Amino acid sequence: MRHLRTFTLALTFIFCVSCGNYLNVQPQGQVIPKTDEEFASIIHKRLNDIEGGEDEFVIGNMDMIKYLEGCSDNLDANIMTSSFLEFFAGEEIDKRQHFYRDSWKIVRDCNIVIGNLAGRDTETAKGLVSASYAIKGIIYYNLMREFCQPWEENLPGIPLVDNFDIDSRPRRGTMKQTYEYTEKLFDEALALNPTDKKYIFTTWVIKAYKAKLEFWCQNWDNVISICNDIIDNSGYLLTPASDYAAMINAPSETKGEVLVRSHVNNSSGLDWYFSYTKNYIATRPACAKLIRLFGENPSEDVRYAASFDKKRFNVKMPECRVRLSEMVLMLAEAYYHKGEKDKALDWVNELRRNRINGAIDLTMSTLPAVRTDERIVVDCKGMAITPLLQAIFDERRKELYMEGDRWFELKRNGRPEWWVISNGLKFTTKAYLYTAPIVKSDIDLNPDLEQNPGYEY
């Protein structure tokens, strides 16, 4: 979709593609912004991209779903591949390089607003600064998940960039430093008490993304605290089974338990493209191991009919969204890793009651035995899967199918390797492919910038 974008920035910035250069802004005959309204045009461009479904970098869009679901194992590429739908991460490296570069352009825009409006006491300034901190924090979270290895605090992180310096050559630092920096960005956004929905990133949306950050970085105490806060105080409730299909397949509305989503503008000029994208995704059936999670009577689980047709092809709206059910699933897993197994199971059952008609609560004694043919065989700590954790993973896979989650679950839990056959050739997803490479031009410009393992140029 990149060739379809029409950038209509009110301000023109001159930038280069390297990390050091494209974060620098050099006015060339342009009026430097001064008023709140002039700075607002920078952030509103980014917000409009989210609402119209053009944004791939903050909340994400259908293109991002197509990539993540195509390269994961939710769809069975061994049965059917398509030239219109990704199937192997190794074929997508060039696209991920574009994602890396374009993400930094958004960081640049956020830094412009933060650097010039922070401290102004107008409601417009505070709204813009809060949104900028939130967007920048989400970009860093996304970059960490895609361009860093699975969480290990001393491994390389993402360069930390606060201002514009054409001579700057920031190093990657560590993942712990990236986590602490990103957490601080979210805290700065929350400190401004954002409530205006025109800036999209209100308090509960920011807290949800902060919970996702804590979850990725395995800070289970923080996950428990934030998720309980959202569940208890946000006013959002798990969508009941009777309303699930309407909520999950709403074309452009934010319904029920959805805290935030992309593509809420139903008059987007890209709607024709999204229609094609949905058709591309529906050219590959769901894999049998996903389908079997719905049991002998899949029609009792409302997620099944809302996700698949009779031939296992996708019918679920492929949108990037953040929902309360994800908070519940993160909470269950956090309790599990803290050793509070009963609380973990309670939340699994709470979700099941809102998804499966006539659901019977699971107990420790009735949890199914661990399946030996699953792709994920160890958790994020390298420990063997248990029946309870398998139940959490099963609900997560069913719940967040076609929302871009499975690829990162595979990465987070052991980076299993597997292969698909296409046109008589075998394509193997190696462990290193779960982490995209840092842009080569940045490595060439800054020899101190460490490349990710597995990539040589």
Q: What are the residue ranges of the model-derived segments?
A:
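Bacterial N-terminal signal peptides that target proteins for export
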Residues: 1-8
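Acidic/polar-rich alpha-helix caps and helix-coil junctions
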Residues: 3, 19-60, 92-272, 294-457
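Bacterial N-terminal signal peptides
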Residues: 8-16
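The N-terminal extracellular segments of secreted preproproteins, especially immediately downstream
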Residues: 15-18, 70
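Transmembrane alpha-helical insertion/packing segments
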Residues: 61-65
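Short alpha-helical hairpin
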Residues: 67-91, 298, 302
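Active-site core of glycosidic bond-cleaving carbohydrate-active enzymes
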Residues: 261, 271-272, 278-293
